[in-house]
Amino acid sequence: MAQRIKQINKWTGSILICTAFLLIIGACNNQSELSESMLEKGVSKELADWRKENLSHLYYQLFFSIPENRKEAVTGSVTIQVDKAEDVPLVIDFRADKKQILSISVNGKKKPEYQFINEHIILPSQILKDGKNEIHIDFIAGNQSLNRNDEFLYTLLVPDRARTLFPCFDQPNLKAEYTLALEIPQSWTAVSNTLVYSDLPKNDKRVIQFMPTEPLSTYLFSFVAAQFQKETRTNNGRTISAYHRETDLKKLNQLSTIFHQVFSALDWLEEYTDIPYPFAKYDFVILPGFQYGGMEH
């Protein structure tokens, strides 16, 4: 009899293990075809194609708090609005340590179920809605693409480094509209892809809010914050500003020539392509020790 009970207990344990295994498999199946290669580090072509097919109408609302001491972390938040297809999860890229994810909410619900695997935040379909979803993530920004100096900071997100800075869908063919707010030291100013909407004091800092961008790929999103000098010129109704930290008078005297070349280049491009300049503004930033001769953002 004791032997019989022992055998029944063994079978029961096996059934429970099998049931648990089936539940795990079922949960995986609900993730709608997420293959192993799709969850590799980086963004595989398979993942990029799958997201392009299943996601649309992307919008990022971003905030970064930039301390004056470059040894202190840059903290941030992102609210992602995205339409998704029926019964599919979301795979959001974030090349950082899991401890840099401070909090997540999904459609207003805090502390949702999620996984963090190989630089991907995976939100299961069960906690999402078919159609429009809103994801809010508080995080510590990665430093890899934050080029920080004691008196300035600039992002450089090419070719695939946006995900080192903030959680996003880091592939060029998922363009999105961005709004950005920066909390920076009072003596600094900031430049981004679009015009400034507001600039307000906040204790010993200032908060600069920028207008929404046109649809952009993640690698083109950019901002610079520094103790800048600003020079502005207008030509044929077009106004351009230059931001710099130069004190050498000989170099500063070259600004007029630089402005002339920029205005001429834009006029030539419009004439050659027969396409008006499509963005809200054009500015340029001159930085010491920049890695490349120039970079468009």
Report each predicted region and the residues it spans.
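Beta-strand-rich interaction surfaces with strong enrichment in secreted/lumenal proteins
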Residues: 64-65, 80, 111-112, 123-127, ...
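Surface-exposed beta-strand/loop patches in extracellular or lumenal glycoproteins
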Residues: 81-98, 170, 178-185
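Hydrophobic helix-coil surface modules that form long, contiguous segments used
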Residues: 76, 171-297
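N-terminal, polar/Ser/Thr-rich
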Residues: 27-75, 147-151, 172
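Bacterial N-terminal signal peptides
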Residues: 14-24
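N-terminal secretory signal peptides that target proteins for export/translocation
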Residues: 1-10
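Surface-exposed, acidic/Ser/Thr-rich flexible loop segments
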Residues: 126-188
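A surface-exposed beta-strand-loop module
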Residues: 95-153, 204
